[in-house]
Amino acid sequence: MTRLLPELYDSRFDEREVSAKDAVWREIVWFLQRYVDPASPVLDIGCDRGHFIRWVDATERWASDIRDMRAAVPEEIRFVQASGLSLADVVPNGYFGTVFMSNYLEHLDTSDVVIDQLRVVRQLLRPGGRAIILQPNIRLVGPRYWDFIDHKVALTERSLLEAAELAQLHTVELITRFLPYSTKGRLPTDARLVRAYLRFRPAWWLLGRQTLFVGEARA
């Protein structure tokens, strides 16, 4: 599957959708910033085009992807081309105040590998650092979860919590219904409407199909 990734993702979103996605992410980061310590480094695993990391406020911004995304990520961001599972070998351990992952864990091969990845995240975090995970929830998405050929592992909020606990990430926040399933779905792409959605929690219960998890690496 790795050799197909560039072709797969290039065909999944056209340039108009990429631009709209960036506008959506600016508003999502506005919401998520409350969980991020701006006085510490942030790492975005599986960063794609850097939709999250380009907007977050932090002393240092790092991004990683198995693909070479340097041309898409702003030059002031430290980009590392590596598998998420090997990051402990190539970036500082115990260094980051926040490690972020979005729509990433479902692409891993097995549930054991999901736990291994979360243990790597725990290893990269400084004491008190936080993992922020946005994750499609198969219980809420249903069969559409498998509409993407590269989805391999099915997770609910409960299995995500269990995996995080096994990785010694202690739950700070769990929002089972947060965002719609994808930017191809029902989340508006106008920035003002996205922010209105994020401020109006009853809408999450109607449209939310992705779970937000925030976990802490305690000393």
Give the location of each predicted region.
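Conserved N-terminal segment of class I S-adenosyl-L-methionine
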Residues: 1-94, 98-102, 112-118, 211
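S-adenosyl-L-methionine-dependent methyltransferase catalytic module, highlighting the catalytic core
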Residues: 15-18, 23, 85, 98-101, ...
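Active-site beta-alpha loop architecture of Rossmann-like, nucleotide-cofactor-dependent enzymes
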Residues: 106
